[in-house]
Each structure stands twice: as structure tokens, then as C-alpha cells.
């Protein structure tokens, strides 16, 4: 089985241009492809993870990845799939985020002489002259076609700014530049990027008279069609300081039964034959598959030691309902107490079990918070310092998410 057929079997491919040519190219290890990452935060997320694993799979098959850091396009903001305009970041923020991305990518992709390369589109986009850009590529874009593009659909309903409207042109120009200066002949991206990617292949065809290729990755959604990679409204980060290895493990351990095999196929490097065996499991036996999924992904992102710790902690907590040394914990300080007490709402927000005080109130009202073995029923519930003595107090959200508070 070639790498193209494996990507198909794993359910990773959504749309492609020139399928037979792409199949032949990637199976022969002759593709030089790029995937772009806009620097909207100081860490990559679980949402980026599938793109990183795709780059790794294709590199292992002999193809050369180009990791494009969007230092320039981030200054505009990608409107794809958005109902609001993205927050404008400063150049300093974008440069800092780009450095964070580079460090994280190096854990997945093999960079170096003759291997993967990393580029930043700020190096060419920030120096563009507007008049020269219009003269060079403006005639290659149809406004009518751009307005019909799916990537602008939701923003058109709320009001698409001219700033965002230029994003497709900038992304297309990236492909044009990479094709000319780096020999990059293929672009990969999320399925919501299809229109932008076609803009790039068309620009190359019209300006250079040559073929370039595009292929989109299936978006990682759950059985209800919602994008995966968030918990309690917060992103699941690859940075261990933003999402602990234990919380990362727990996110994947708690996926719905209907999603576990799909996640194995799309995100792990487990052999398809092994995944097929897990697919035979039903009922409570599916927990074995979930544990395997969580372990594999935690090992990929955080290493074997952290995966082992997370597995041990999760088993201890679920089996005994007790305290594990590797359970996520917060040491409370004097600043957290008012008149010697701390509120249940503050505990939920401090532990990130709830993304906001409003969400914390809703969680308590819906009976979703336990402190020790007792359900917290009052939104004004408080705890005195004595509650956190010794091994501390374990707070539980729902059935599966734990956090320990100590002094």
C-alpha cells in the first residue's frame, strides 16, 4: 500500500486536484509540499496536530515538507469558518508566537539539510508594494469567484472586512512564491481552505503556465459534526504549560465511543490492522481503545515518560476515585482566600475546569461539580482552608475530569 492509499484508508483526504498525478507523486516521494500555520497563539493546538502528523507521514514516505509560518498572513487574519473578525495581534506577539511554533514543530518534523524546511511568509509579504502586487496578480483573481468562496460564507453574513477579503490573495501569493523560489509543487490544508488553495494553483497556472497541486485534509470532527480539539470551551494545547500531559491524555481518553476509532485512524501511527482489531470492541471494552488512543497521542506529543505518568494517574483516579501524584493540581495561596475561604466558582476557574465564572455557575447549577464525594449544589458555596489540608481536596467535573487543590 502506497502512502496515498494509506491516507485514504485512514480517512484523511477530503478534496484533491489532479488525483492520479498527486497519487503518483506522493507514492514516489517526489512531492515538495507545504502546510501553513498562522501564529494566532503562542502554542499549537490539537487542531493542528493532524496537519503535523500528515507532514510526518509524507516525510517518512520520502516527500519533503515545507512548514510555512504565517508571520505575514496572521497580520490579516483568516476568515475561514469564522463568524467574527479575528483579534489583531502586534508584530511582537506574532514574532513570539512564530518562535513558539518552530520549537513545537521540531518535535514532529525532521528539519535540516535536504530534509524539511521552515519558512516565514513575513519575509516576502511584508515587503510587498501594494501597487506592484495589484499589477502582478490582481488580474488573476475574479471578485465574483472570490465572493462565492466557501471560506467567506459565514463572514459575509456578519460583514466581511476588506482586510479579511485580501487573505485569499495573500495565501495564493504564498504558494506562487514557494513554487518559484523553493520548488514547492503542492499545498495541503484543512478542507475549509479549499478555495484559498485553488486560488494558488490558478495563480501559478496563469502567471507561470505550470501545474501545481492541492489536497485538503478532512476536518477532525466528532460524531455530532463539531470540531474536536477543545474542552470546556478552551483549546487543547500542545504546550504542556497550557494543557498538562495529564489533561491532554484525559481529553482523548474521554472521546465518545463513536469517535475513538476515527481518531486512531486519523491521528496515530498505529498499523491499520491493529486499529481494525480495536474496532471490533463494543460496550465497556471500548475503554481499552480509548486508553490506547490517549496513550499513543500523549507519547507523540509529550514523550513516553509523560504518557506513562498520565496513564498511571488516570487508572488510579478512575479505579479508586482517589488522589494520584500525577493528577493535575493547584497549590492555593493566601491570595486565593477571602476571610479564610475560597469559593467553588473560583476553584473551577483556577483549575480551568470552567473557562469563565459564568460557565462555572452553569456547571454548578446543572449539578456537574463534586468536591470530594459531595455534590456542590449552591453557587455561593465556599471552602475553608482546613478542606485542603493533607492530601488536599479533589474537585470533580462530571464523571471523568479531576483536579486536586492543596495548600
Regions found by a protein language model. Give the residues of each.
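Positively charged, low-complexity intrinsically disordered leader regions
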Residues: 1-33
Amino acid at each position: 500500500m502506497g502512502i496515498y492509499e494509506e491516507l485514504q484508508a485512514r480517512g484523511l483526504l477530503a478534496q484533491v486536484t489532479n488525483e492520479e498525478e498527486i497519487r503518483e507523486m506522493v507514492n514516489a516521494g517526489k512531492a515538495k509540499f507545504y502546510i501553513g500555520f498562522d501564529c494566532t497563539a503562542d502554542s499549537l493546538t490539537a487542531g493542528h496536530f493532524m496537519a503535523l502528523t500528515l507532514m510526518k507521514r509524507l516525510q517518512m514516505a520520502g516527500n519533503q515538507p515545507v512548514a510555512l509560518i504565517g508571520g505575514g498572513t496572521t497580520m490579516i487574519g483568516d476568515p475561514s469558518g469564522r463568524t467574527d473578525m479575528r483579534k489583531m495581534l502586534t508584530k511582537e506577539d506574532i514574532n513570539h508566537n512564530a518562535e513558539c511554533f518552530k520549537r513545537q514543530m521540531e518535535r514532529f518534523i525532521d528539519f535540516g539539510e535536504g530534509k524539511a524546511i521552515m519558512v516565514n511568509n513575513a519575509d516576502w509579504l511584508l515587503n510587498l508594494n501594494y501597487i506592484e502586487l495589484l499589477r502582478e496578480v490582481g488580474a488573476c483573481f475574479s471578485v465574483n469567484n472570490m465572493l462565492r468562496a466557501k471560506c467567506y460564507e459565514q463572514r459575509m453574513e456578519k460583514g466581511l472586512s476588506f482586510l479579511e477579503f485580501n487573505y485569499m490573495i495573500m495565501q495564493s501569493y504564498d504558494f506562487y512564491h514557494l513554487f518559484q523560489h523553493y520548488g514547492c509543487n503542492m499545498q495541503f490544508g484543512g478542507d475549509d481552505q479549499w478555495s484559498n488553495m485553488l486560488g494558488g494553483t490558478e495563480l501559478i497556472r496563469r502567471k507561470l503556465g505550470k501545474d501545481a497541486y492541492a489536497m485538503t485534509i478532512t476536518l477532525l470532527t466528532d460524531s455530532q459534526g463539531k470540531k474536536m480539539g477543545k474542552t470546556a470551551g478552551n483549546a487543547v494545547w500542545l504546550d504542556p504549560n497550557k494543557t498538562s500531559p495529564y489533561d491532554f491524555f484525559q481529553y482523548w481518553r474521554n472521546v465518545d465511543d463513536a469517535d475513538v476509532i476515527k481518531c486512531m485512524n486519523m491521528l496515530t501511527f498505529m498499523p491499520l490492522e491493529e486499529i481494525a482489531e480495536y474496532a471490533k470492541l463494543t460496550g465497556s471494552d471500548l475503554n481499552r481503545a480509548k486508553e490506547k488512543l490517549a496513550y499513543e497521542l500523549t507519547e507523540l506529543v509529550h514523550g513516553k515518560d509523560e504518557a506513562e505518568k498520565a496513564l498511571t494517574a488516570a487508572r488510579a483516579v478512575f479505579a479508586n476515585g482517589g488522589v494520584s501524584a500525577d493528577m493535575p493540581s493547584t497549590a492555593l495561596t493566601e491570595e486565593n482566600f477571602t476571610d479564610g475561604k475560597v469559593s467553588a466558582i473560583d476553584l473551577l476557574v483556577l483549575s480551568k475546569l470552567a473557562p469563565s465564572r459564568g460557565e462555572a455557575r452553569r456547571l454548578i447549577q446543572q449539578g456537574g461539580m463534586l468536591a470530594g464525594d459531595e455534590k456542590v449544589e449552591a453557587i455561593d458555596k465556599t471552602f475553608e482552608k482546613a478542606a485542603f489540608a493533607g492530601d488536599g481536596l479533589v474537585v470533580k467535573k462530571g464523571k471523568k475530569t479531576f483536579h486536586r487543590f492543596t495548600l
